[in-house]
Amino acid sequence: MKLTNFKRSVFIAMLVVLFGTFSNAVSAQSNKKQKYKVAVCDWMILKRQKLGAFGLASEIKADGIELDMGGLGKRPTFDSKLGDPIERQKFLDKSKETGVGISSIAMSGFYAQSFAKRDSINLMINDCVATMKNMKVKVAYLPLGTESDLTKNPELRPIIIERLKWAGKQVGKIGGVIAIETSLNATEEKKLLEEIGCKHIKSSFNFANAVDNGRDIATELKILGKKYLAQIHASTTDTVWLENDKNVDMPKIKKTLDEMNWKGWLIVERSRDVTQVHNVKANYGANVAYLKKIFQN
């Protein structure tokens, strides 16, 4: 009798494992067919370059994560595990296991560090491009941040253009794209991209930039155009969840992107409810669910 119960338990355990694997495979296959996919920033869900980011993203039903290169500070390059083949493989295995993809490789260190003034920019970009190549990720996210804000520091424009032209050549070698986030409006950002003149440098459009400056998101997207749009940070400065944000007309945004025939990743960075700003699962779960409701229905 005990042996029979043991066999039954083993059989049930095997079924659970097989069902989990099958579910992840079905989920991954379904994600591949979606025109719009929804990701979360690993550093914003407090899992910067941690394997747990995949599990948490899966739990809140995100299709992927934007995987950060790690801290920068005054280091010559990013504090990244991803240059180590053994560590890198762990991330690739976890992505496959959970069915959670990698939307892009982020260089979030440039939020605070100056892309225009740092000496070792070549090493940083090359490390990121190598990571993209080794992880088969086609997009890198580069925020120009406070230190290279072209609205406040227009004198930095020539050096930023020069460096982005060089960076475009490097990422072009692997057929990838560096998606830059600037403080410029869509008209000025398009002019910047035209001046750079490299198909491997595009825009990472941020809802927050438009909303914080009183601009209509859909109009800005139309101006920027499909050609220059690599990915979208589909969230605003922390106040309320996206579904409660009166400044974000999500059905209108989807209609605009449909008309542009654009497809790609919508990435949740913020839009946290300030009354529960530290509740990661509630904030990111709600925003992911709302984006999927609008864009994947």
Indicate where each model-derived feature is located:
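Bacterial N-terminal signal peptides
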Residues: I12-T21
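Active-site acidic/histidine proton-transfer and metal-coordination neighborhood
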Residues: K96-T98, Y111-S203, V211-D212
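Glycine-rich, proline-tolerant flexible connector loops at the mouths of alpha/beta enzymes
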Residues: D68-L92, L144-T151
